[in-house]
């Protein structure tokens, strides 16, 4: 399963669980548009005051240097950040 397929399932699960979900576009892979800084997690989910940044990875996928840096920065600011490689991992978190 690709990261994109996992991400679609994650968005659906989060929405069904009552989260407001934002897909954050930080890369230029498809349309040469960058809306967020490099390394920004793929999803931002909000529910009743809980803010969760989610980086999706295919099983065995590794974080880039910019992703590690951004995740560290977010956590230093008190944010909850998760790196998940499947729906079951995400389901356990929410």
Which residues does each predicted region cover?
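Catalytic phosphate/metal-binding cores of nucleic-acid and nucleotide-processing enzymes, i.e., regions
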Residues: 1-94
């Amino acid at each position: 399963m690709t990261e994109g397929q996992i991400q679609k399932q994650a968005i659906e699960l989060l929405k069904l669980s009552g989260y407001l979900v934002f897909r954050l576009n930080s890369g230029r892979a498809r349309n040469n548009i960058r809306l967020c800084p490099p390394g920004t997690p793929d999803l931002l989910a909000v529910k009743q005051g809980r803010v969760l940044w989610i980086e999706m990875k295919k099983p065995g996928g590794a974080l880039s240097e910019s992703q590690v840096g951004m995740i560290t920065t977010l956590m230093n600011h008190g944010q909850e950040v998760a790196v998940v490689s499947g729906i079951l991992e995400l389901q356990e978190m929410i």
